[in-house]
Amino acid sequence: MADNMTTTQIEVGPGATNATINFEAGILECYERFSWQRALDYPGQDRLHRLKRKLESRIKTHNKSEPENKRMSLEERKAIGVKMMKVLLFMDPSAGIEGFEPYCVKNPSTSKCPNYDWTDYPPTPGKYLDDIEEEPENVDHPIEVVLRDMNNKDARQKIKDEVNTQKEGKFRLTIKRDIRNVLSLRVLVNGTFLKHPNGDKSLSTLHRLNAYDQNGGLVAKLVATDDRTVEDEKDGHRILNSLFERFDEGHSKPIRAAETAVGVLSQFGQEHRLSPEEGDN
């Protein structure tokens, strides 16, 4: 299975979440206009309603992390999203949005290129994704948890017990899922813990998340460059969905991979990075 498997990589840069939300709001506006023409079939109407619900939820969460003067409503984002489409479809810089100038990527000499950081976000100098080492950085006294053939409730409790020994600061955690001596899941996490006055701990920064298949091949790598926090509200859920699908293809009890990952992420307060379907498992 590992021979034909490619590694999926994501690099998180500033502004990408905002731009994506605005773009999807523009798509929603197009869906709604199409619906007003009575040209949208029933599956299309269903997609329209689901997209609207997801966007409203995502905007609400994202706005909490934004300064008050940068918070925008769905309607405001729709207007920006439609302009973004004009830029993309017609390569028209006159319709340009601040921070969104794909025309400038091809024509950097043009005078209408004030800023296009998010479209061409530079990685850490000398640290392009393909150059970043596969293993997260080493830290003192890394935690390794091997979950042998046990039920998922016991597995989650063992993870919780091990994680609770972690002190404040950077950490590295390896989770292995061993069922009948078959290594079905391995997740390697690098991040930073904060310890609160009441004794609770939270994951303040997720620097890396590597996941491996049964044969030890790297399946997915989630990277936050320059120690930036992986942006809020489900930026990683698609990569995790893809990861679980690949595990599912090669294991007799695929749900264990998803359930174990739910348990791992829940210990760090990161359940929102899972899709609703995964969270229900």
UniProtKB/Swiss-Prot annotation:
InterPro entries: NS1, uS15_NS1_RNA-bd_sf. Changing K70A: No effect on dsRNA-binding and inhibition of IFN-beta promoter. Changing K86A: No effect on dsRNA-binding and 45% loss of inhibition of IFN-beta promoter. This is Non-structural protein 1. Changing R71A: No effect on dsRNA-binding and inhibition of IFN-beta promoter. One of its GO terms (biological process) is symbiont-mediated suppression of host ISG15-protein conjugation. The keyword RNA-binding applies. Its main location: host cell. The lineage of its organism: Viruses, Riboviria, Orthornavirae, Negarnaviricota, Polyploviricotina. Homodimer. Interacts with and inhibits human G1P2 conjugation by UBE1L. Changing K54A: Partial loss of dsRNA-binding and 15% loss of inhibition of IFN-beta promoter. Pfam families: Flu_B_NS1.
